[in-house]
Amino acid sequence: MTNPQPPSRRVAVSPPFDLAKTVAPASWARGRWPNVDARRGAFVWVGWEANQVVWRSVRQIDARTLEIIGSGSSERDVHWASAVLGASAAIPVFDDPILAALARKHPGLRAWSAGSLFEGVVSSIVGQSISVAAAATTERRLCERFNDGLHIDGRQFWPPPRPEQLASSSAAFVRETGVTTKRAEALVAVGTLFASEPTRAAFDTDPVAAVQQLASISGIGPWTIQSALLWGVAAADAHPTRDVALLRAARVHYPVVSDLKDLDRLAEQWKPYRAWAARLLWLDLFGYDGANATGDA
């Protein structure tokens, strides 16, 4: 389905704000993510709003202004920019001299996320122990399985599955997207856990309250939970323990880090902003749209 071009509207942001750096993770999979992409100065997002599939395409006009087009409600643009682009939360002050230097180097970085703990959990289950590119490809197959796509800006996008869609599916059906049986079972269980709208809202408001219930699901461990908190709702201190990509990024700046145990020990010094530290290190390694990256996710 091709969408007509709706009128644009503008949203104010507080500087420093850098859209390209903020949504850099969307560009690391080189167009493979099913519902987001960052290229040619624009960030495209497809998701759910008031039980409908909507889309937004965002460009940064100047230091204080974002231009948005799309079918999403203009009345929700400010909320969306806060929830998804992290527009209301700037980089914290770090005592660590390396992180402080990276924060000065990337002052406009904000905490981009899905804006939904459920979506963060789904992505993290799919992404267990595989590369960003492989995770994006598998997640696209999962999204294709449940919903029709939208053609936007020259490519096809698909919204994430709804909790009730996963809850009503068999593990065998989900398994056909390419995930393992254990992960398929975990995805169905997560759909069941989040199927109640009040539960979803409560978990998004207080995501830590969901941790114990998520940990009880077979196939969901500490890395999955922490990644879901980081990428789902931009939790400031989420730490994806044993994350190989973070180890690569940390080694560039911290010679004392040789293995994952060293990384976890170092991360203790980053509290209560371990997620921000990870974002800065990843950004410095993998780069962003319009800049040369030094690594490959």
Model-derived regions: residue spans:
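HhH-family (HhH-GPD) DNA N-glycosylase catalytic core used in base-excision repair
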Residues: 1-297
